[in-house]
């Protein structure tokens, strides 16, 4: 049966001002990491700002207070999101961040434009809500959410090749799939495995 208590739990969460629970701390860490990554992108365009360094350091200092959370320490090790040679996990996060700037259907003018990263999150959200409406168990809800969140990860490698183009040549879909798997292994799965993240690779 559909999860009848979802709305009540959602309302209770937003009414509760205590933000010290584990999920809230994970959300805080993700917020600071993403904000630091974004700031690192725009920082070179504002080199004359005297506060540049202090702003950049503020993100790392906030994350330093959350290093008891699994993965946070590795993400910021050596200021990973301000570094040209981050850890395996930091490198994967940087790769995923690139999808924020990759536009879907880039050759087809649309208003508003949508990014690949935004599309992936939207699919993940729908997958979770559809799972709720179907009465799926918690494990399936989580699996469906993350399947949606990473379903277009290969577009990091093949960029925006629209479906009509893929279908216009008989062998193109299979060739693209083979290339995607090869490059995912080389650029994503291989480095993560080498960095000790085999469990993450298995889930991806």
Question: Which positions does each model-derived feature cover?
Answer:
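Alpha-helical phosphate/pyrophosphate-handling elements in metalloenzyme active cores
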Residues: 109-143
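Active-site-adjacent bridging/hinge elements
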Residues: 93-103
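Acidic/His metal-coordination segments adjacent to aromatic residues that form catalytic metal sites
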Residues: 15-19, 101-108
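Short acidic (Asp/Glu) and glycine-rich catalytic loops that position anionic groups and cofactors
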Residues: 103-105, 125, 157-164
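Divalent-cation-assisted or electrostatically stabilized phosphate/pyrophosphate-binding catalytic cores
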Residues: 21, 25, 55-58, 114-116, ...
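An active-site-proximal "capping" alpha-helix that borders the catalytic cofactor pocket
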Residues: 1-2, 122-130, 177-191
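Histidine/acidic-rich helix-loop-helix segments that form or flank divalent-metal centers
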Residues: 2-61, 66-90, 137, 144-145, ...
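His-Asp-centered metal-binding catalytic motifs of divalent-metal-dependent phosphohydrolases/nucleases
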Residues: 1, 31, 143-159
